[in-house]
Regions:
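Conserved, mostly hydrophobic/aromatic
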Residues: 15, 36, 63, 87, ...
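Short gly/pro/ser/thr-enriched loop/turn and capping motifs at secondary-structure boundaries
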Residues: 43-44, 66-68
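Generic signature of intrinsically disordered, low-complexity segments enriched in small/polar residues
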Residues: 9, 34, 67-70, 102
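Short, solvent-exposed loop/turn segments at secondary-structure junctions
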Residues: 18-19, 65-67
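Mid-to-C-terminal alpha-helical segments outside catalytic/metal-binding sites
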Residues: 55, 70-109
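Catalytic pocket-lining loop regions of alpha/beta-barrel enzymes
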Residues: 1-59
Length: 109
């Protein structure tokens, strides 16, 4: 697959694979250059992703205007309750790290 052929390219898998979340998770487990954007995944699925690969390669995404922004944010806040580092990573820190790994030179801060 392309993700294996281009290890220096960062791949952001939208909606964490949507209905194919198992395939997206397998890719993230196998390839360190795979990141999962979590729009449209429920709180239970998000908790499962965090348990499987940790929060370090999960990125906040809302899929707005098709999915309510508040719902996506609420599930992140729920699943990361008491885990401030995970919350900060998912809500922005991971995006900065992913873009830095891709060669971006300007911070979003």
């Amino acid at each position: 697959p392309a993700i294996a052929a281009y290890p220096r390219v960062q791949f952001l898998l939208g909606h964490a694979g949507a209905r194919d979340v198992g395939d997206a998770l397998a890719a993230a487990q196998q390839y360190p250059n795979a990141w999962l954007e979590i729009a449209c995944q429920g709180a239970t699925q998000l908790a499962g992703l965090m348990g499987a690969i940790g929060p370090e390669r999960l990125l906040f995404g809302s899929d707005w205007p098709f999915y309510p922004l508040a719902a996506t944010l609420a599930k992140v806040l729920l699943v990361t309750e008491g885990k401030p580092d995970a919350r900060a990573a998912i809500l922005g820190g991971n995006a900065e790290r992913m873009f830095a790994a891709a060669g971006a030179t300007r911070s979003v801060s």
